[in-house]
Amino acid sequence: MLYQQISQNKQRTVVLLVVFFALLALIGASAGYLLLDNYAMGLVLALVIGMIYATSMIFQSTSLVMSMNNAREVTEKEAPGFFHIVEDMAMVAQIPMPRVFIIEDPSLNAFATGSSPQNAAVAATTGLLEVMNREELEGVIGHEISHIRNYDIRISTIAVALASAVTVISSIGGRMLWYGGGSRRQRDDGDDDVLRIITLLLSLLSLLLAPLVASLIQLAISRQREYLADASSVELTRNPQGMIKALEKLQLSQPMKHPVDDASAALYINEPRKKRSFSSLFSTHPPIEERIERLKNM
């Protein structure tokens, strides 16, 4: 059951990424049709913009991410218990030892960052280290180590970059149309050409809806990677109860004291900001109740 769940989560992520690239291609083709009278040119430009965004974000410095989240690096002497658990989980996962950071915050939370296992880091709040026992900490750190081993940070970064690219292309296309960039096409099409009018309307609709759809796909990818990391943590620790108990404590945690931006919020094991009341479709994290239920059903 454990390996089946891991496999299903990976497959869902692949499907979502394929849909994401298809959406980027669609928005590029639509913008190309409306502004350049050339589907192919718009499609190529969209993919190039997407790749530039993804590449620039993937190689963002680990130290910069930690600095943005008020995390300070610690040595084995400063936090031996935490350090050794990270070391043990990294050894079991067969990845290099990540750098270890602590965030001075009473809330219960942790996250990992780094585009590859070779430049990864793990951070935990002081609240988490104080409240959780060893088996619960192993579950949490196993979750973060799994994000590193599964290249989740890279996948999530690509998703954020693609969502940003879709939004930028849609915004540029909309502004150019508003200021007359599409007037030539509107004159050439003619009211009697029904097919062209339908194509024009569909292209406009895709420009309007693409940013929302892109955001929903990005958030869905983030939620799937959380489920995968939970299951992968159990694979590393061989102790589902440790992860379940940790999630039960995380469920009761207060929001973090310092502000957390959207990109950083998706990295944490638990939503670091005040819980929102709207649909889970717009959440970076699946409900903890569902995460616990999945672990119990393994």
From Swiss-Prot:
Q: What is its EC number?
A: 3.4.24.-
> What GO terms describe the biological role, i.e. biological process, of this protein?
proteolysis
Molecular functions (GO terms) = metalloendopeptidase activity; zinc ion binding
Q: How is the cofactor bound?
A: Binds 1 zinc ion per subunit.
Tell me yes or no: is Transmembrane helix among this UniProt entry's keywords.
yes
- Which positions, given as ranges, span the membrane? 14-34, 39-59, 158-178, 197-217
Q: Does the keyword Nucleus apply?
A: no
Q: What cofactor does this one take?
A: Zn(2+)
Where on this chain does Zn(2+) bind? H143, H147, E226
Keyword annotations from UniProtKB, A to Z: Cell membrane, Hydrolase, Membrane, Metal-binding, Metalloprotease, Protease, Transmembrane, Transmembrane helix, Zinc
The protein's superkingdom reads Bacteria
- Top-level enzyme category: hydrolase
Q: Single GO cellular component annotation?
A: plasma membrane
Recorded hits in Pfam families, A to Z, give: Peptidase_M48
Name the UniProt record assigns to this protein = Protease HtpX homolog
